[in-house]
Design a protein with these regions (language model features):
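Conserved class I S-adenosyl-L-methionine
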Residues: 1-32, 45-49, 170-174
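Class I SAM-dependent methyltransferase SAM/SAH-binding core
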Residues: 37-76
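A conserved beta-strand element that flanks and buttresses the S-adenosyl-L-methionine
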Residues: 88
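A short His-aromatic
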Residues: 94-95
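Short, glycine-/aromatic-enriched active-site segment of Class I SAM-dependent methyltransferases
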Residues: 119-137
């Protein structure tokens, strides 16, 4: 059993993942499509919202415990080219070992749109905090890095939005069972972004259209 299998229920119940301006934006951007693939679906929140909007959705995730329709990594999607009108990936790219390969693979199986949401790189302190909380965190990327990456993977960047999200700090630590000295160090590292117990996270949503 992987660490993600152990965390699956916490992510299904997570308010951070089940709501937010970026989730609403993804659903809006996908409007009019009939089919979608949600990559690294996690708790399944994007897939659920797209199904509620009337799309036929397939979900994928590398962790069996996430209960996705297909178990596979983002870098190796077992689908033919242009299999889905829309491909989505929300709050997962910072875990990808090769984000460019994963983005190119998601673009390959999309016929029209690739929609990505992820947290933005803020500072070295922020990255240290993320690694302490979750060793599977590879890195966050800057807005400029994302804006450069999509055109390099066969997509025209049609739109992007940057905004912030404030989440409860302690549940964020509890979700990955981070306690003791690691939790204390994380609190120190992110102290300048915490107000009234809520952590500010900067986030980007990107809409890439297949060429």
């Amino acid at each position: 059993m992987s660490v993600w299998d152990e965390r699956a229920e916490a992510y299904r119940q997570s308010r951070e993942h089940s709501e937010g301006w970026d989730l609403e934006l993804l659903v809006d951007w996908a409007g009019g499509a009939r089919t979608a693939l949600d990559v690294a679906t996690g708790g399944g929140h994007v897939a659920r919202r797209l199904r509620e909007a009337g799309l036929e959705v397939v979900s994928s995730d590398p962790a069996p415990g996430m209960r996705a329709d297909v178990v596979c990594p983002a870098e190796e999607l077992p689908f033919a080219d242009a299999s889905f009108e829309v491909v989505t990936c929300r709050l997962a790219a910072h875990h990808f070992e090769d984000v460019k390969a994963a983005t190119a693979e998601m673009a390959r199986v999309a016929s029209e749109l690739l929609l990505i949401v992820d947290n933005l790189w803020i500072s070295g302190k922020d990255e240290e905090a993320n690694h302490l909380r979750d060793p599977s965190h590879v890195r966050n990327y800057s807005a400029d890095e994302w804006r450069k990456l999509l055109p390099e993977t066969g997509l025209d960047l049609e739109d992007d939005r940057v905004g912030e999200r404030r989440i409860e700090l302690e549940p964020w630590l509890e979700r990955t069972r981070t306690t003791g000295a690691d939790a204390e160090r994380i609190r120190e590292l992110v102290a300048d972004r915490v107000e009234d117990g809520r952590l500010r996270i900067d986030r980007i949503a990107l809409k890439g259209r297949k060429r």
